[in-house]
Every structure is written in C-alpha cells, then in structure tokens.
C-alpha cells in the first residue's frame, strides 16, 4: 500500500478552499445572459468552446491532490444538479463557493462546524418552502418558449423550437437533440418509442464523452426469455455480421457467457452491438415487447409461439433508423413497422383502456399508448462549423431540461432575483448562536448568483442588488441583457423552480460536507526510480574500424 499524506484542520481547509475557488472561478464566468465563453483544449481536434457550467467543471483536474479534492466535491454539485434538473449547474457552483467561503471563515473564528451545518440546513429548508409557495405554473406555449429562450442564453429560435416540439409530442414526450449535416437547425417529429432500460454493460457505449450507445440503421432482436447460451445465438449473430449493420438485443436478461462474448466482440470491432433488458414485468413485459415488434416490423422470439432462437432469420428481426441507449433509457427512432399495424395496435390499447376498471392498469396502458402514438421529436442542430454546432447543442440540451423542469414545478423570476428575495424572508432561528451563524451564511450566499450575473454584465453588483431589494414586489429585478430594471416575468426573465431549488439543495449539501471536514488523506506522489547508469567507464576514445 502506498504511503499517504494527511492534513488536518486549518491547513486542510485552506487547500480544499483553494481547489473550490479554482473550479468555481472558471465556471462562474459563464453565468447569465452576458456570461463569457470558456475554451477547453482537446487532445485531438479543435478546442471546444462552451458556456455550459457542468462541461467546464468536468474538465478541471488539479495537480495538488488536496486542492483537487475540494474541486471535485464542487464538481459533484454541478453534476448532481445537472442529473436532477438538467440546468442550473453554474448557479449551484456559485452558491456552493459562497457557502464554503463564509463557512470556512466561521470555522476559523472558532464556531462549531456541526452547528453551522444545522443552521445551513434550517435556512435551506425555509427557502425551498418559500420558492415553491411563490412558483407560477406554466400553461401556454409562449411561456414554454420563454423558458427555453432564457436557458439557451437568449436565443429566441431555440425557445420556439422546444415549445413546438413539446406541443407536438406532449410535455412528457421524448425529445432528442442531434447534430445536423446542414447549417440550419430544424425540428422533425418521427415515429419512435422510449423505455426505461439502459445498456447492460458500459462497454457497449459508442460515445464515451456522453456515455451513450448510438446505433444507426440497426437490426433489433426481441427475445422474451433470458439469454445465457451463446451457441443458440450464433446463427443470427453471423447473419447480422454479414450485413455490416449494428444489432440491438432486447431480452429478459443477457448474462454469463453470452454477455461476455458480445462485449468482447464489440471491443474487437467485429460486431456493432448493444443489449438491454426488456421493459416492464410479467405479462406487461410481453405486451411491451409486442409493441416494440409492431413499431419495428419484427417478431418477438417466444417459445410459446414455437420459434427457437437457433432458427431465427433476418426477416424476423425489427429495424430502426436510429437507436440511442443511455445508462437509464433506450430510444428507438423511426422503426420499420407498417403504419396500419401501428394504428391497429393503438386502437387495441385504446379499447383496453376503455374496458379496464383498475386505475393502475389504465395508467400503464396510457403510458404504452403514449409511447406508441406520441412519437419522438428530433431537433437537428445546424451551424457553420463543428465547434459552433457542439456549443449550440449544449445550449439546446440545457434549454430542453430547463423547460421540462418548468413544466413540472412552475417558474419564479430569473436573474437570481428569486433567491435574492428569499434571502430577506428567512426568519428561522437556530438553537444557539452558531446555528444562527449558519442561517446567516445562507442569507449572504443567496445574493451571490444575482451578484455574479451583474458582474459578468460589467455592472456594479452592490448598487444593483441594493436597488432590487429597495422595491418590495417579488417580480422586480434587473435585466442584465439590456441594463433595465422592471418586472422580470413580464420581461420574460424566468427560472424553473426545480432548477433553482435543486441548485440550492445540492450546493448546501456539498458545502456543508466541506465545512465539517477536519482531516484529508491523499496518496503521496510516487518518487521516480533512479535512471539507468551510463556506459562502462574507460571506453571513450576507442578507434572505429
């Protein structure tokens, strides 16, 4: 076991705080409508330009092990907020930095870290309650477009595209974002389906950066039982290899020898393949496999029907233009099923919905109906260069997540105003002075997102924040894009409650851990082995024959 270095107390916290500051300072320049770009060097290809907080955070790795621990903890804030709300990563990072800074000062002044943490938790709980109480629900397509526009850094067309996509496939519908081959960004609705099962092995991934397996123009094998015997699968695998097309296997499970062999073949590059578990359980699994079969023009391989795996031919496999698989979901786009068959299946499910008396069954049938009939909206992102397309795609992904979050929990005034207003409404008291200090830490930290947005726009933060707080109306704030004061919601500057709430909760959670840290342990850097000695002595000056 390698030797470790241990740091305690103040020296540990100082190192950690430095790491937090390096990461947060790089991320927070992207906040707001006048946020700056960050350029990231890539080991191959052109540098990447982004205004996406989590993308910047993921690129930062520090040389000093202790500083790096601090940076990675805050990176975790950005990642977690991104996973839950899909946006608000920069806000979460700014809040975490503010809470850690104030907390470190309080601990250095001799306050009890555990009481500070309790005070922080009390204040956060009250702010969350306040945010949910003043949320406004989103109803119209215009409001959806507004949210999308703001999250896409003020690009109106992106907001309109997202609103149109949500109108076509419903708020819970599947919307995917792809890179286009042209300079224009366009929206297309295709017949598709998404279910909540991800890849069985991360080795199936084709895009390691996004951890996604994409299969273009794929065959789909649908099997209702477990697959563990490789011999039975060989004929169909060989037939697919001959075509040069990728294969998706959907089965109850793929395990043991079968899964290992598929992974090895994928890694060697002989077979483009991915495997996922079939969605649902019991009879519903059979029904959902049948739905996928109808959508893709394939057949479910079932021994009840007398079809053995050994005798499967290519025409029994389904086909789809594109399959996209993440850790949690599989999306099948543009299946090769006949329109008349799909319509027949939809009518059959509608009839079952009418007949059923169970609310649970009705809900599950409606889910199946939405998957079959709803389709998938595809936003194809265009641009003049590859760098521009990637940057725009990041923004559309953010905007899409923000819009979904807004539809779920409603909206509050944007521009950091909602948190700013909540900061003066905190009335909760702790059990002692140290807990009250924790409450005050949150009170001050809640001003940091608004201040950062104003600073990034090149204005004086203290003056702007003071002016906003002078007015007593919840919606009054500052438009950093135009430099005007007014009603934020009327100006279309809004934030989804889910994004603001998640950013605050995640930031407070990780910041509390950092404040209560008393010791840090890291591996000592390995000493380089001594170099090989030079040649034998006394051999200089030999005559060359």
Curated annotation (Swiss-Prot):
CDD domains assigned: GroEL
Catalytic activity: ATP + H2O + a folded polypeptide = ADP + phosphate + an unfolded polypeptide
Gene Ontology annotations for the cellular component aspect, listed alphabetically: cytoplasm
Classification via InterPro entries: Chaperonin_Cpn60_CS, Cpn60/GroEL, Cpn60/GroEL/TCP-1, GroEL-like_apical_dom_sf, GROEL-like_equatorial_sf, TCP-1-like_intermed_sf
Gene Ontology terms: biological process: protein refolding
Keywords: ATP-binding, Chaperone, Cytoplasm, Isomerase, Nucleotide-binding, Plasmid
UniProt-annotated location(s): Cytoplasm
EC number: 5.6.1.7
HAMAP family, per database record: CH60
Subunit structure: Forms a cylinder of 14 subunits composed of two heptameric rings stacked back-to-back. Interacts with the co-chaperonin GroES.
Family as reported in the entry's similarity comment: Belongs to the chaperonin (HSP60) family.
PANTHER family: 60 KDA HEAT SHOCK PROTEIN, MITOCHONDRIAL
Protein's name in the database: Chaperonin GroEL 5
Provenance organism: Sinorhizobium medicae (strain WSM419)
Gene name, Swiss-Prot/TrEMBL: groEL5
């Amino acid at each position: 076991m390698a030797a470790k270095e241990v740091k305690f107390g103040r020296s540990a916290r100082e190192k950690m705080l430095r790491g937090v500051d390096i990461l947060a300072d790089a991320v927070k320049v992207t906040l707001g409508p006048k946020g700056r770009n960050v350029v990231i060097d890539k080991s191959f290809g052109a540098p990447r330009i982004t205004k996406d907080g989590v993308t910047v955070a993921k690129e930062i790795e520090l040389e000093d092990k202790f500083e790096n621990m601090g940076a990675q903890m805050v990176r975790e804030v950005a990642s977690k907020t991104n996973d839950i709300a899909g946006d608000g990563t920069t806000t979460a990072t700014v809040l975490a930095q503010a809470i850690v800074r104030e907390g470190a000062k309080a601990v250095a002044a001799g306050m009890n870290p555990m009481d500070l943490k309790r005070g922080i938790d009390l204040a956060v709980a009250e702010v969350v309650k306040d945010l949910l109480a003043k949320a406004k629900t989103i109803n119209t397509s215009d409001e959806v477009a507004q949210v999308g526009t703001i999250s896409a850094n003020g690009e109106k067309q992106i907001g309109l595209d997202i609103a149109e996509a949500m109108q076509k496939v419903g708020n819970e519908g599947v919307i995917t974002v792809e890179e286009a081959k042209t300079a224009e960004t366009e929206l297309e609705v295709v017949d598709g389906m998404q279910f909540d099962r991800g890849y069985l092995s991360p080795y199936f991934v084709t895009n390691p950066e996004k951890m996604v397996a994409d299969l273009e123009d794929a065959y789909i094998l649908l099997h209702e039982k477990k697959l563990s015997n490789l011999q039975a699968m060989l004929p169909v695998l060989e037939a697919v290899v001959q075509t040069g097309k990728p294969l998706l296997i959907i089965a109850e499970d793929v395990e043991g020898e079968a899964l290992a062999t598929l992974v090895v073949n994928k890694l060697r590059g002989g077979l483009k393949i991915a495997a996922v578990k079939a969605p649902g359980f019991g009879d519903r699994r059979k029904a959902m496999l049948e739905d996928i079969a109808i959508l893709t023009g394939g057949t479910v391989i079932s021994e009840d029907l007398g079809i053995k795996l050994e005798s499967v031919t290519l025409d029994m496999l389904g086909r789809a233009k594109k399959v996209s698989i993440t850790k949690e979901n599989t999306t099948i786009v543009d299946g090769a099923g006949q329109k008349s068959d799909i319509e027949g299946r939809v009518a059959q499910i509608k009839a079952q919905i009418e007949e059923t008396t169970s609310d649970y069954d009705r809900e599950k049938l409606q889910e199946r109906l939405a998957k079959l009939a709803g389709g998938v909206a595809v936003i194809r992102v265009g641009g003049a260069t590859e760098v521009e397309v990637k940057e725009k795609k990041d923004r559309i992904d953010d905007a899409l997540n923000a819009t979904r979050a807004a539809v779920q929990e409603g909206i509050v005034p944007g521009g950091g105003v909602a948190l700013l207003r909540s900061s003066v409404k905190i009335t909760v008291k702790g059990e002692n002075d140290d807990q009250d200090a924790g409450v005050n830490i949150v009170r001050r930290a809640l001003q940091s997102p608004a201040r950062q947005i104003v600073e990034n726009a090149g204005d004086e933060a203290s003056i702007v924040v003071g002016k906003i707080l002078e007015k007593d109306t919840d919606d009054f704030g500052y438009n950093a894009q135009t430099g005007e004061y007014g009603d934020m919601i009327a100006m279309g500057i809004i934030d989804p409650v889910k994004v603001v709430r998640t950013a605050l909760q995640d930031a407070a959670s990780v910041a509390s851990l950092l404040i209560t840290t008393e010791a840090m342990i890291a591996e000592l850097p390995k000493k380089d082995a001594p170099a090989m000695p030079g040649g034998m002595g006394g051999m200089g000056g030999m005559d060359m024959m």
